[in-house]
Amino acid sequence: MKPDAFIDELWSYAAEVPMEQHPWFDGIVKHRWTKEQIILGEVQHYLRVRTNPIFFGHMAINAVSAKEYTVMETVLENFMEELGGKRTHVDIMLQFLEEGGITREQADNAEPAPGTLAAIEMIIGCCQRRSALEGVAM
């Protein structure tokens, strides 16, 4: 499948369930989660987000190795969106956690839940061993 067709297919999946219908966000909006539960969930989110540079490194290597220069541009755009500029995804996560009373040190020392650890390992494995485009899709 051509990269553009694959990207279109992926966006069609993303459009099937609007973000506000995701169980996590739905629970926040409908006040099913307590403040403490939200903070604990966001600590887990932080533990995953802080590994984004690892994912992007593997994707960049795979794109260049395969001479997929348009995919490399997409990887670079994603990298800059996540890690460039004045406020990175990690910065935003840390601000949220600090407002909830969690320091960076506490977040960094938190134990990943089994699902968080599995997600991190799955994404790293995909980004290492699959195409750069499949890594971006993760």
Task: Please provide the spans of the model-predicted regions.
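Phenylalanine-focused residue identity feature
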Residues: F6, F25, F55-F56, F79, ...
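Acidic, low-complexity proline/glycine-rich segments
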Residues: M1-F25
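Alpha-helix capping and helix-coil boundary motifs
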Residues: M1-A5, T34, S131
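Active-site-proximal alpha-helical scaffolds that flank and shape metal-associated catalytic sites
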Residues: S12, T70-M138
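Short coil/turn segments at secondary-structure boundaries
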Residues: Q21-I28, F56-G57, D108-A110
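Short, charged low-complexity linear motifs
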Residues: D26-W33, K67, R129-R130
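Weak global preference for isoleucine
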Residues: I7, I28, I38-I39, I54, ...
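Alpha-helical bundle segments that constitute or directly flank the non-heme di-iron/ferroxidase center
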Residues: Y13-M19, R32-S65, E81-G85, G135-M138
